[in-house]
Structures are given as structure tokens and as C-alpha cells.
Amino acid sequence: METVTHGQVLARFGHALSDATRSRLLLALREAPGYPAELADLLGATRQNLSNHLACLRGCGLVVAVPEGRRTRYELADIRIRHALDDLLGLVLAVDPAACPDAAENGCC
């Protein structure tokens, strides 16, 4: 097994967040686990596109696939990811002057 540095781990996390669809997907999974078809509809993405993003997030270790019979449910790999996303989102909304002021109350943006 290859050992990675803290910088490499953070770079992988940054790569996961660098795409708006992946970021929205992580935020959706922060709320609840989901199935690919439902997540694609929620995000307005094609199933193929969503599948590619889920593969990326799995490769980064942020998301896991849980087989359920003939379906697969996706969820965050660790509860700490949810807390990290909450903290990161709160920080970014606090310091970014372009952030939507209604995001925290309305769950938009």
C-alpha cells in the first residue's frame, strides 16, 4: 500500500470538490444516502455523467457503494465527511462575498 502525504490527501479532496456537480452530489449525500437514478434526477444530470462523478468520489474515498439486492445505494464513506462539509460550507459562505445570502436558510445554491 502506498503512503500518501497530507498534501496529497487534501489535493484529492480538493479535486473531488473542484467540479460543481460533484460538490452538489456530496451535499446531497450529506443529507441522505441515495440511488443513482434519484440522484441524477435531483441534480439534473444524466445517469452516465452521475456514474462518472460517483466513481471519482469513490476513488477519492469520500463515497461508498452499498449493494441492496439489484440496486446500489451511495452514501458518504464516514460521518466525519458530513461534518467536514458542514464546516467547510459554513466557512466559505462566511468569507465569500459572492455567496448567496439565502443559502443557509433556504438550502439553495
Predicted features along the sequence, with ranges:
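N-terminal helix-turn-helix DNA-binding core of bacterial DNA-binding proteins
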Residues: 2, 8-46, 68-81
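Alpha-helical residues within the helix-turn-helix
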Residues: 41, 58-59
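Residues within the DNA-recognition helix of helix-turn-helix
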Residues: 53
